[in-house]
Amino acid sequence: MTDDPAATPRPETSVNARPAFSGQAPIKAEYLINTTPIVESASASELNNIHPDDAAEGRTDSRDSRDGRDRPDNKRRKPNKQDKKDKKGQNKGRHFPVIREASVRICRAWETTGICDRADKGDCRYAHSWEGYFEVKPNDISYRPDWSLVGEAPFVVEGERVVGGEDVVGKTLDLDTVCPVLKDLGYCPFGWRCRFLGAHVKRVAAAVDGEKEKEAGPEKRMGEWQVENWVQSEVENGWKQKETNWPEHEVLNALRRSTASFPFSEAYLKKVDPDKPFTLQNKKPTKQQPHKRKNNVLDEEEAANGPTGIPSAGDDEENAMNATENERNEEKGKVYGETEAIDVPLRPEEKRRLNWEGGRYLAPLTTVGNLPFRRLCVDYGATITVSEMALAQPLVYGAKEEWALVRRHESEKMFGVQVAGGFPNRMVPAAEVIANTIGKGGGVDFVDVNMGCPIDLVFNQGAGSALMDSPGRLGKLLVGMNRALGDIPLTVKFRTGVAHGKPNAHKLIPRFVTEWGAGALTIHGRSRQQRYSKPADWEYIKTCVTALRESVADANLPPVPIFGNGDCFSAASYYEEMDRSGVDGVMVARGALIKPWIFTEIKERREWDISAVERLEGIKKFAEFGLSHWGSDTQGVNTTRRFLCEALSFQHRYIPIGLLERLPAKLNERPPAYRGRNELETLLASPFAGDWVKISEMFLGKVDEGFSFVPKHKSNAYGGEEAQG
């Protein structure tokens, strides 16, 4: 018998008889469905590139012209360097079209008030009648939270659909469905557009002649049906739909038009960078007359009077220079008149204390760290959460999409906003506008500076981990933000350094606290060059903890919390890393993406062999939270579906601990092909995007035509993800 393992038959029942592959999870033999070890061509990225999958539905020919299979002689060429590169990394340029109701789009002004000024002038392109809308509106999604979840198909034991009637409205209704938004909020702001409409309508007497006009807009009447619990929610005391951090419309308009006032930023930047004039405009300001805006940008009333409460562009400098010292110093920590003190951080006693010891900290995560996901992690036991990374420049320019990232749910008891940028002239104004818009109402407990993001797009602009090699610029940035934020603490998240083998975090840490005023620190135990390819260096994190403790003691400062980050995937690893390094806690990033219930494990100090049904319960919660956040109309349902699939593109990597030969599980271990303990567990482990969509249909109904999903990472998150530091 030859010694070649490829040619020698191996006993199928012996795991030890199979050669060990680096990074392969040790799954018990009885759950393996293929005794041949996985090879590169059987990776998850290959499985998701099979042509019958969602991404290839538009093909008329299943052959791939790129690899030469469509050549007449059918000779496949050898893969070149570009082919190999295309099969790994991110699926860049993903496009998710906004899917709304087909054909008919209702005017929102008419829908909410019954009045549309543009319609009277004949220039509104939207519909002002519900007639025709229900001809194309999809049927209600059938959903009840009390439906049983089981481990075998169909996985969700549904009840029968109760159709409302044969009329145009009734035939779309399911009178037995439950609206998750109504269940969560007590009302539904989506009215007739809700895809769970049967949960909040009732049959009334048919309308008589002459009452047809009353069926429009806010009268909430359509034929013999009347919608109930339809409330157009408004922001009250900073809160709307159990969420806060809704900047006022006038504030965003002022930011977009560069008419907002930044008195502290202007004074500070003039002090620390006198050679760089302060401007918020996209292009250099000229001495000519102000640019005349088009009528469709600024309505007549605002053009005449200016946005309420926001100084006009011409008043900014005069107001900043002429305000009395008392007026300028009204907000704590913002010293506009005392220029000799403006470039030093506030004293620790002037800031709120961050008592984070033992806190369960969810990392800021691009795309997948959205509000519904954070809410799910809080439900599992997370106590500290941070927004997705927001870029400083779009915040200062009033970009609606960027401000949506800082939204906070009422369940997030300790919440921070993470900001990325490379220069003081953007980061300091961003801190000032955050403090003035959402900081006053308690919408943010701390602001975190991203100093760890490794991606080229951020790094090449001097932001993220690039800041670690520019301590002079970094110091100006942090001190300015520290003062602009007033009593709101400033925290930093950073890596060991930029280049592998040349760490410099231990040199910066004493300055973070004693010179620049950071209120808490988080260190990711890898360099920018390493990304996520090597294990986190917890010995170096221990060195950094020692450097912090010594510098704080020497300066006679109160304790400053420091968290470690890297490879935490179980309660055992969490407490082992804490004990080994001396950190106050461990920030959880990828581990939470793959198993959000890790926070329950940490809280209860146990390894949870979670069942497939319990995992499906978590997926159902995410769907409910997503509908409350993004909406229960067609557009909201599809947005929720998209982000649910994003979550499943990570969660499918979880290997049930009951299937493993050893514990704890390791974050970067890939499983060979295996089956679960029941049919549902096998489905939840599927690397196919089509199966993730199938899982979403259990709670969000059948997919609409035109919906498709392409995972963000070709390797389905096996070490290739880009996170915010």
From Swiss-Prot:
GO terms for molecular function: flavin adenine dinucleotide binding; mRNA dihydrouridine synthase activity; RNA binding; tRNA-dihydrouridine47 synthase activity; zinc ion binding. PANTHER family: TRNA-DIHYDROURIDINE(47) SYNTHASE [NAD(P)(+)]-LIKE. Its EC number is 1.3.1.89, 1.3.1.-. Residues 284-295 have a biased composition (Basic residues). Its cofactor is FMN. GO terms for cellular component: cytoplasm; nuclear periphery. This is tRNA-dihydrouridine(47) synthase [NAD(P)(+)]. Gene3D superfamilies: Aldolase class I. It comes from the Eukaryota. The lineage of its organism: Eukaryota, Fungi, Dikarya, Basidiomycota, Agaricomycotina. The keyword Nucleus applies. Its main location: cytoplasm. FMN binds at residues 364-366, 418, 493, 524, 565-567, 589-590. The gene is DUS3. The active site is at 453 (proton donor).
